[in-house]
Curated annotation (Swiss-Prot):
Residues 1-24 are annotated as: Disordered. GO terms for biological process: maintenance of root meristem identity; positive regulation of stem cell population maintenance; response to auxin. GO terms for molecular function: DNA-binding transcription factor activity; sequence-specific DNA binding. Keywords: Developmental protein, DNA-binding, Homeobox, Nucleus, Transcription, Transcription regulation. This is WUSCHEL-related homeobox 5. Belongs to the WUS homeobox family. PANTHER family: WUSCHEL-RELATED HOMEOBOX 1-RELATED (PTHR45940), WUSCHEL-RELATED HOMEOBOX 5 (PTHR45940:SF41). It comes from Arabidopsis thaliana. It is found in: Nucleus. Specifically expressed in the central cells of a quiescent center (QC) of the root. Disruption phenotype: Abnormal quiescent center (QC) in the root apical meristem (RAM) and defects in cell differentiation. Transcription factor, which may be involved in the specification and maintenance of the stem cells (QC cells) in the root apical meristem (RAM).
Amino acid sequence: MSFSVKGRSLRGNNNGGTGTKCGRWNPTVEQLKILTDLFRAGLRTPTTDQIQKISTELSFYGKIESKNVFYWFQNHKARERQKRRKISIDFDHHHHQPSTRDVFEISEEDCQEEEKVIETLQLFPVNSFEDSNSKVDKMRARGNNQYREYIRETTTTSFSPYSSCGAEMEHPPPLDLRLSFL
């Protein structure tokens, strides 16, 4: 890529045209125009050599370092992405908004809600739970200690993690894996 400068600025090398010394780079109008033109021409991530050439060319219009060029392109890409995201979100939000007619128009079908049925899925079938779901619910209603005792009794075998050669060990009850939509 070739970079050409068509003329010198009347400002010369005076710290970016501000007239004051500052730690922050303040680009001149000419520097911004050239950087913007390069960006619009498709240059998004210049190589190290390209950055060096650009900063040399831009130094005719004011103080500039290679890092300024590098960060300008990084920031400009980020701003462009942000704008695209915002436009996309605004577009999606606009097209997914229900119309006022949809919001205020209620049909008879909407008013007649069906009773929701809660279904328990058996993810980890265990015989002691299969045949005693109602018994478990009753035990839960009576109290947490009785429920724990019931669980310990129904799950303690010589091969159970709740048993240590016949001696009971204190463990929390197994997780309730029923799906609840309340």
